[in-house]
Amino acid sequence: MKVAVLGAAGGIGQALALLLKNQLPSGSELSLYDIAPVTPGVAVDLSHIPTAVKIKGFSGEDATPALEGADVVLISAGVARKPGMDRSDLFNVNAGIVKNLVQQIAKTCPKACVGIITNPVNTTVAIAAEVLKKAGVYDKNKLFGVTTLDIIRSNTFVAELKGKLPTEVEVPVIGGHSGVTILPLLSQIPGVSFTEQEAAELTKRIQNAGTEVVEAKAGGGSATLSMGQAAARFGLSLVRALQGEKGVVECAYVEGDGQYARFFSQPLLLGKNGVEERKSIGTLSAFEQHSLDAMLDTLKKDIQLGEDFINK
């Protein structure tokens, strides 16, 4: 099993690479790519960690050597948020980066499962889909927007509020991956209940958690370490499913049947070919239903922006 991390010299990429070097199954290969010349050195640094995961780093304009034979590609390349920016302010730079990298994936490892971490995810996933489609290699079961950070934040905040162990809580999060499009289904957590006010406040905190980190870092970056953890969790789940493990479920932002929007984050059963089944979002509370209805316009506009970037 070969996993490639694109954007591996950045804050998320290095954290993700460290976790994968430690946690990928024995015999796996990990390849790191970034435009930055430090990348081969990041791989050498990680290569000293005593796990049976082979690692190699590549830098420069051409990601091809890192992508050859990859089963899973995780893309974290791009610029990070600074105070006062929202995820959509990143669009102008990151759209071009994602387009370029996905074009290289389409040529070199078109059958790989691709996880997009680069923000704004609502839009960059649509860009990736259109690039793959133009190249004639798009498989909607193999392209994912990684929204796992919203899930792990939800798990943490719910556990804190309700005095639970974070490992005991698993919150499904649907919709998209920015602002109002992030919708934690707090009503579906077994054995935990919330007042209407608690649900509204907690939902808002989860939606704005990225900004909480950006502001706390005072201009020094955005959420890199927790995002590295989230991306590793998703990547490792994908690897386990690709290797035949049954019953692996994660939420991610994928193209579905278009019931809510062309791309939508929902619980997915993962399997040997990527998405095996898009699971139902279940019964929503009145607050959740209202939030879902209210966000769809925003989500659809985000998606349209990505489609237009490639097609216009």
From Swiss-Prot:
One of its GO terms (biological process) is tricarboxylic acid cycle. One of its GO terms (molecular function) is L-malate dehydrogenase (NAD+) activity. Its EC number is 1.1.1.37. PROSITE patterns: MDH (PS00068). The active site is at H177 (proton acceptor). NAD(+) binds at G7, A8, A9, G10, G11, I12, G13, D34, N94, I117, T118, N119, M227. Substrate binds at R81, R87, N119, R153. PANTHER family: MALATE AND LACTATE DEHYDROGENASE (PTHR11540), MALATE DEHYDROGENASE, MITOCHONDRIAL (PTHR11540:SF16). Belongs to the LDH/MDH superfamily. MDH type 1 family. Homodimer. Catalyzes the reversible oxidation of malate to oxaloacetate. HAMAP family: Malate_dehydrog_1 (MF_01516). This is Malate dehydrogenase.
